[in-house]
Regions:
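Adenosyl-5′-phosphate
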Residues: 181
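ATP-dependent adenylation/nucleotidyltransferase module used to activate substrates
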Residues: 1-150
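Structured loop/turn residues at beta-strand edges in well-structured enzyme cores
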Residues: 86, 154, 168
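A short alpha-helix-loop-beta-strand transition element characteristic
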Residues: 150-156
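Local cysteine-cluster metal-coordination motifs and their immediate loop/turn environment
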Residues: 77, 157-178
Length: 181
């Protein structure tokens, strides 16, 4: 249901790079009720301001306009079910401190992670552990760790627009540029 599919092609490239199987399924119907600025059924424009500016606008009291309600909860629940079915031991997701700041993305907060970690563990009979290794790290620290590990950043995409090149103006472009500086 996103306005662009660029992240999907990048996910495929990254899975191929690491030689891992990528499993995907269409969850568009689940998000068809959300009309935030990221969704194709929305006429709202993606903000061309930094997350800090967006958080300032909301006074840190509500999510930013690119928040998809409970998206990570839905993704993590589905991933836990698939992981258990495939005899995996853990599900890992990339929540980080910057996304949790100022209530921007409530499903990236440490309290959300703790609640989901318990729910996933209990809901799978102790079969799946949820991990969020970046939950207390900012994007600059994550980029530094990725560079140390030789992450193929050229295969990644952060921009909320789906063009050939990042727009350089949306919150994710601005934060990515700052993280690499």
């Amino acid at each position: 249901g996103q306005k662009h599919k660029k992240e999907l092609s990048c996910a495929e490239k990254i899975a191929n790079y690491y030689g891992v199987r990528r499993i995907s399924f269409d969850v568009t119907p689940l998000f068809s009720y959300s009309h935030n600025s990221l969704m194709e059924n929305s006429d709202k424009a993606v903000p061309k301001t930094s997350y800090a500016e967006q958080i300032e606008e909301t006074k840190g009291q509500s999510p930013v306009s690119t928040y998809v309600p409970f998206r990570n909860g839905i993704f993590l629940s589905a991933a836990a079910g698939v992981a258990l079915s495939l005899d995996c031991e853990r599900v890992v997701y990339g929540a980080h401190a910057d996304d949790a700041a100022g209530a921007a993305y409530p499903d990236c907060s440490p309290s959300f992670f703790d609640a989901m970690k318990t729910a996933v563990y209990e809901g799978t009979g102790g079969g799946i552990t949820l991990k969020a290794p970046f939950i207390h790290m900012n994007k600059a620290d994550i980029v530094a760790e990725g560079l140390r590990l030789h992450v193929p950043y050229e295969l990644t995409w952060s921009c909320y627009e789906g063009g050939d090149k990042p727009c350089g103006l949306c919150g994710t472009c601005r934060d990515r540029e700052a993280a690499f500086a």
